[in-house]
Curated annotation (Swiss-Prot):
The record marks 30, 81 as: Important for tRNA non-discrimination. Its EC number is 6.1.1.23. It catalyses: tRNA(Asx) + L-aspartate + ATP = L-aspartyl-tRNA(Asx) + AMP + diphosphate. It comes from the Bacteria. This is Aspartate--tRNA(Asp/Asn) ligase. The gene is aspS. The lineage of its organism: Bacteria, Pseudomonadati, Pseudomonadota, Betaproteobacteria, Neisseriales. Its main location: cytoplasm.
Length: 602
């Protein structure tokens, strides 16, 4: 029987006989003495096998990397000069008495300690990849976070309740994953994008405080921080307002970071959505980067420079500046790369001014400002730009001029890129945890393609008090009782106070151009139950995958999920999704269209 984990044997076990079981991480033959580094989930221990124990020596001699061994031996100090203070087991070794080969292993597709492996190779051989210490650490931390969440919410009186995985499709927002019903031919279940409606119904049912760590599914285009199936920390409360809900969930985040990382997150400042977009161009600003937008739209309405004037006069246009301290040293090549970068977000170019001498702000050839655009701007505008941005000698000022959405996304992304690349060396990046709440979101945003307003969060979010009439009269300025928790530029949680009155919910549906008939067909079960004395309620959902990605510093969300999908929504380990035979399709009353069938065969 195993007595100890490999990585947990320390000096306290000196002269004791122990039995460890694990995988051969490395095997070395040093002049007739064999050394084996044996690995299990807790780490590595060094085992010494000498010829005085011939059976153990023969077993060790036959072992290769990834063989599974059971080793019994005596714990002793390592020789002087061979210790490793970074490991719990770094000062001891095991002198083997007995070795049993529990299983041989084929040569693995890569070495466990190889750090230069392509992601495709790793995902195809995910089981071997999961043996790597970094992956073991990531998934252990994920477990610690999940358990910390459970402990905290249990102590706060929350009840863990499961909600259905097979539910009805409500095609609003992202596409649903559909599951055909064999019993009801031609009808489909949908996998839940979130437990939203069920958790609201649990509040109507009187459970008061609910939580669940659950899988959710969205059939959407994938990015580095997205998966078709993801894990959500979901919670809902009755009779609490947004301040009280934010206090509870902020406390949870602080406790989890303290327990898992030993980190004190400190205060969570609150920032209105309008301020976040005005200064940072993002509703999830990275506050580690001390760079802000400077508004120039009003100034450019009287300038002749067409690029800036056109954006300033455009309906929904915006002109901003982004001052970067010590940025005048950026090379032409670097600026060209930044220009190409903002093009990803729809920007047609990237104007800039290098500030060489703030004492000479003319627009002539001897100007202290260096840029192709200086001659097109009035001296008054140049002075105002320098005054508003607070630019000093040696700085560079970048400009965004276009539709507000393009400017916010392009210059917002540039702010992050420049901040991460140059901020630490130039004093405008702080490498620490910077949490905040973003509040007072718009209730609606206009969808030009659909030619109607859509919900910014979801259609069950309550309007801010005093804004109910604006849903009809001025939907663009109607604010929601919504809040997002943001950490270092990532939205890790989002929530809102919900609508608990059926008449208000019907008004929101009407503002979204959802007819009474469609309301009843899609959401009749919600509207009907809201009429039976629904309490005021609200909640929040955290993305567990994103949270753990941040906490581990992993490059990809796929590094904190045991068996993730690729960016093409495939599992390379199991080759899912896969074809099914005609018999299965017939049982489901389905038939592939000819084009789809031909594509599969190809």
């Amino acid at each position: 029987m195993r007595t100890n984990y490999c990585g947990l044997i320390s000096e306290q076990y000196l002269d004791q006989t122990v039995t460890v079981k694990g995988w051969v991480h490395r095997r070395r033959d040093h002049g007739g003495v064999i050394f084996i580094d044996l690995r299990d989930r807790e780490g590595i221990v060094q085992v010494v096998i000498d010829p005085d124990t011939p059976e153990a020596f023969a077993a060790a001699d036959s072992a290769r990397n990834e063989y599974v061994l059971s080793i019994t031996g005596r714990v002793r100090n390592r020789p002087e000069g061979t210790t490793n203070d970074k490991m719990i087991s770094g000062k001891i070794e095991i002198l083997a008495k007995e070795i049993e080969v529990l299983n041989a292993a084929a040569t693995p597709p890569f070495q466990i300690d190889d750090e230069n492996i392509s992601e495709n190779v790793r995902l195809t051989n995910r089981v071997i990849d999961l043996r790597r210490p970094v992956m073991q650490r990531n998934l252990r931390l994920r477990y610690q976070v999940a358990m910390g969440v459970r402990r905290y919410l249990d102590a706060q009186g929350f009840i863990d309740i499961e909600t259905p995985m097979l539910t009805r499709s409500t095609p609003e927002g992202a596409r649903d994953y559909l599951v055909p019903s064999r019993v009801h031919p031609g009808e489909f279940f949908a996998l839940p994008q979130s437990p939203q409606l069920f958790k609201q119904l649990l509040m109507v049912a009187g459970f008061d405080r609910y939580y669940q760590i659950t899988k959710c599914f969205r059939d959407e285009d994938l990015r580095a921080d997205r998966q078709p199936e993801f894990t959500q920390i979901d919670l809902e409360t009755s009779f609490l307002n947004e301040d009280e809900i934010m206090d509870i969930t902020e406390g949870m985040a602080k406790q989890v970071f303290k327990d898992a990382l030993g980190v004190d997150l400190g205060d969570f400042p609150r920032m209105p959505y309008s301020e976040a977009m005005f200064y940072y161009g993002s509703d999830k600003p990275d506050m580690r980067i001390n760079l802000k937008f400077t508004e120039l739209t009003d100034l450019m309405k009287t300038e002749e420079f067409k690029v800036f004037r056109g954006a300033a006069d455009m309906k929904g246009g915006r002109v901003v500046a982004l001052r970067v301290p010590n940025g005048a040293k950026f090379s032409r090549k670097e600026i060209d790369e930044y220009t190409k970068f903002v093009g990803i977000y729809g920007a047609k170019g990237l104007a800039y001014i290098k500030v060489n001498d703030v004492g000479n702000l003319s627009n002539g050839e001897d100007s202290g400002l260096q840029s192709p655009i200086v001659k097109f701007l009035s001296e008054n505008a140049l002075k105002e730009i320098i005054a508003r941005t607070g630019a000093q000698n040696g700085d560079i000022i970048f400009f965004g001029a276009d539709k507000t959405k393009v400017v916010n996304e392009a210059i917002g992304a540039l702010r992050i890129k420049v901040g991460l690349e140059h901020g630490k060396d130039n004093g405008y990046f702080t490498d620490e945890w910077k949490p905040l709440w973003v509040v007072d979101f718009p209730m609606f945003e206009y969808d030009e393609e659909a030619d109607r307003y859509v919900a910014v969060h979801h259609p069950f979010t309550a309007p801010k008090e005093g804004h109910e009439d604006l849903m009809v009269s001025d939907p663009a300025n109607c604010l929601a009782r919504a809040y997002d928790m943001v950490l270092n530029g990532w939205e890790i949680g989002g929530g809102s106070i919900r609508i608990h009155r059926a008449d208000v919910q019907e008004k929101v549906f009407a503002a979204l151009k959802i007819s009474p008939e469609e309301q009843q067909e899609k959401f009749g079960f919600l509207l009907d139950n809201l009429k039976f004395g629904a309490p005021p309620h609200g909640g929040l959902a955290f993305g567990l995958d994103r949270l753990v990605t941040l906490m581990t510093g992993a490059e990809s969300i796929r590094d904190v999920i045991a068996f993730p999908k690729t960016q093409r929504a495939q599992c390379l380990l199991t080759n899912a999704p896969n074809s099914v035979d005609d018999k299965q399709l017939r049982e489901l009353s389905l038939r592939l269209r000819q084009k789809a069938a031909e594509t599969k065969e190809a």
